[in-house]
A protein has these predicted regions:
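N-terminal small/glycine-rich loop or linker at the start of catalytic domains
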Residues: 34, 38, 96-105, 140
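Active-site-proximal loop/turn and secondary-structure-junction residues that shape catalytic pockets
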Residues: 46-48, 66-68, 101-104, 137-141, ...
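Conserved beta-strand positions in the central sheet of alpha/beta enzyme cores
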Residues: 63, 97-99, 134, 176, ...
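Short amphipathic alpha-helical segments at helix-loop
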Residues: 76, 106, 145-149, 232, ...
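Charged helix-capping and loop-helix junction motifs
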Residues: 76-81, 111-118, 150-161, 213-217, ...
Length: 290
């Protein structure tokens, strides 16, 4: 089972009182959104960007980028995080996750700075109360050559994720590997890493576009999913090529209770209106109150 911040807190000696280990803000956020249901978040470009807009859309959380390559990441700056904390406190919308998009051009397995960036991001996630980190592998960072893993890169990735996993677990943060992989490939990789702090960040749009059986993958990845990205090219959810109802059924079948993060487009060019439309669709799909 993938580690969640709520699981981390419940495992402490005094429940939420033990949240002092991860900061007062994290304690507040751990109880801000019920863990007994799916939560809906979005990347900043999918709804208008501000936490106020996210609240108007009915979102529970926002996925935030960590910034571009630098010795010290943007998100590692306490002043940057303080602004996000104020946004959270003002709106009740939490930081669901941090996205390390810079790793697509500076791959986790090979870039000498990548382990330090991951450590900085874990510290930032812990401070912000974010439960997950997106560790992506696209473009030159993709883990596959054809249908097979790139052996040197994958071997290096396994070692680096093994090294980072204890810090993530101690902070109550899950590391989500996002790459267009089948469930079988994900499980092979995750079994090699061997930590419940590392799981699959599954993108339904990318996977459907690659011809994968998304509902079957979701069922096979029960207990190994950190989060999911929902998108369908340039379409509103439910109106494109991705068949959403079987995906919703699969998530219910595995009793998924984590985050669904929108990575949707804006067909009308009104980001907030489109963000609300897609949020409402996901809530209806998953049987959540609007």
């Amino acid at each position: 089972m993938i580690l969640s911040r709520r699981t981390f807190l419940k495992g402490s000696a005094a429940g939420l009182a033990g949240a002092a280990m991860i900061s007062d803000l994290a304690a507040h956020l751990a109880s801000a959104v019920p863990a007994a249901r799916v939560r809906v978040g979005a990347r900043q470009g999918c709804f208008g960007g501000t936490f106020e807009a996210a609240k108007r859309c009915g979102l529970d959380g926002v996925e935030i980028g960590v910034g571009g390559p630098a010795e010290k990441l943007h998100i590692a700056d306490p002043a940057v995080r303080e602004k996000f904390k104020k946004d959270v406190q003002a709106t009740g919308v939490v930081v669901s996750s941090l996205s390390m998009d810079l790793l697509n051009g500076n791959p986790m397995p090979t870039d000498p700075q990548a382990p330090a960036w991951l450590e900085q991001t874990i510290d930032a996630a812990k401070d912000l109360g974010a439960v997950g980190i997106l560790v992506p592998f696209f473009g030159k960072a993709h883990l596959l050559a054809g249908k097979e893993f790139k052996k040197p890169e994958t071997d290096a990735l396994v070692e680096r994720m093994k090294a980072a996993a204890p810090k993530a677990k101690d902070g109550g943060v899950s590391l989500g590997i996002e790459c267009t992989l089948s469930a079988r490939q994900y499980l092979e990789l995750l079994d090699r890493i061997g930590s419940d702090a590392v799981g699959a960040y599954y993108d339904i749009g990318n996977s459907a576009g690659a011809g994968l059986d998304v509902p079957a993958d979701i069922r096979d990845l029960k207990g190994r999913l950190t989060m999911l990205h929902f998108k369908d090219g340039g379409n509103y959810l439910g109106e494109g090529k991705v068949k959403m109802e079987p995906i919703g059924e699969a998530l219910k079948a595995i009793d998924y209770k984590g985050w669904i993060v929108l990575e949707t487009s804006c067909p009308s060019k009104n980001a907030e209106a489109d963000g609300k439309r897609n949020t409402d669709f996901v809530k209806k799909l998953m049987g959540l109150s609007a």
